């Protein structure tokens, strides 16, 4: 491959990594927000059984959403790591060509 091809590869991988990191940050923020919402649910001691069930269900829904976001974030972290490996390999080839 030529120097230009390696440079294009490195640039494309840099862009992909930046995009994935942006998505990961958004998912991390969403997960933290869902956990905060779950933690802020309060149940009065005088609440009816139906209210208690409703609040617990609401808390479970928030925690499920947080766990889903954490899982998606972990998947993106793996993709970022793979892209970084490819980018580093392309950068090494580029340095050898120069």
Which residues make up each language-model segment?
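Short, charge/polar-rich alpha-helical segments
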Residues: 1-29, 68-74, 78
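General helical secondary-structure elements
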Residues: 4, 19-20, 32, 49, ...
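Long, charged amphipathic alpha-helices with heptad-repeat/coiled-coil character
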Residues: 10, 70-98
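General helical structural elements
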Residues: 12, 28, 63, 88-91
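Extended, low-aromatic, Leu/Ala- and acidic/polar-enriched alpha-helical coiled-coil segments
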Residues: 56, 60-63, 67-70
